[in-house]
């Protein structure tokens, strides 16, 4: 909560006090929790099941309230699972500290890691592993730029999902 809620509150207060007009916020699909039917649209009820999702949702609420009070307008981008890197390797999962599934799988495939551990094999899916909707890091960067353009052109505060709308099992 310190990073995603308290620090965000401090940042939003400073932005409002210094005349910032537009904010693009990196949120998460974790705000949905486990949606009925397995799919989440922007209209799906938010019911986070972990502190990460709750803390991001709290920041979305602060953005909403600040915009309603005449502060900056915002677009909250709800990321699903970010994967990949840009060709030069400066952003994304080619960086040394990246620990996400796709990076781990690539390291295993190239012999830099002994294998991939799969946690959770009792999901109600054909192979028992969780389904994930991945989005490439470059497409996510484009979404940020598009969101900023939208706000600069007079767009109203909104929330957008950032994924492709198709899930792959962890084992896939």
Predicted regions and their residues:
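Active-site loop of short-chain dehydrogenase/reductase
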Residues: 19-23, 71-73, 114-115, 154-158
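Glycine-centered small-residue hotspots that permit tight backbone geometry or close packing
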Residues: 26, 53, 92, 120, ...
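Structural signature of the Rossmann-like NAD(P)-dependent dehydrogenase/reductase core
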Residues: 23-25, 75-81, 117, 133, ...
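C-terminal substrate-binding subdomain of Rossmann-fold SDR/epimerase-dehydratase oxidoreductases
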Residues: 102-172
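Hydrophobic pocket-lining residues that define ligand/cofactor binding sites across diverse proteins
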Residues: 15, 67, 147-151
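Conserved sequence/active-site signature of Rossmann-fold short-chain dehydrogenase/reductase
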Residues: 31-32, 82-84, 140, 165
């Amino acid at each position: 909560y310190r990073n995603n809620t308290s620090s965000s509150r401090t940042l939003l207060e400073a932005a409002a006090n210094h005349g910032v007009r537009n904010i693009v916020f990196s949120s998460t699909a974790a705000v949905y929790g486990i949606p009925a039917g397995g799919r989440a649209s922007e209209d799906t009820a938010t019911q986070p099941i972990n502190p990460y999702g709750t803390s991001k949702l709290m920041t979305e609420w602060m953005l909403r309230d600040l915009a309603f009070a005449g502060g900056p307008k915002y677009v909250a981008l709800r990321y699903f699972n970010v994967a990949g890197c840009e060709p030069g390797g400066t952003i994304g999962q080619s960086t040394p500290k990246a620990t996400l599934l796709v990076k781990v799988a690539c390291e295993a495939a190239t012999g830099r890691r002994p294998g991939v551990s799969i946690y959770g094999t009792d999901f109600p899916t054909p192979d028992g592993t969780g389904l994930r909707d991945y989005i490439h890091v470059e497409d996510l960067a484009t979404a940020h730029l598009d969101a900023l353009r939208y706000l600069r052109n007079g767009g109203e505060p909104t929330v957008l999902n950032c994924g492709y709308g198709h899930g792959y099992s962890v084992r896939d």
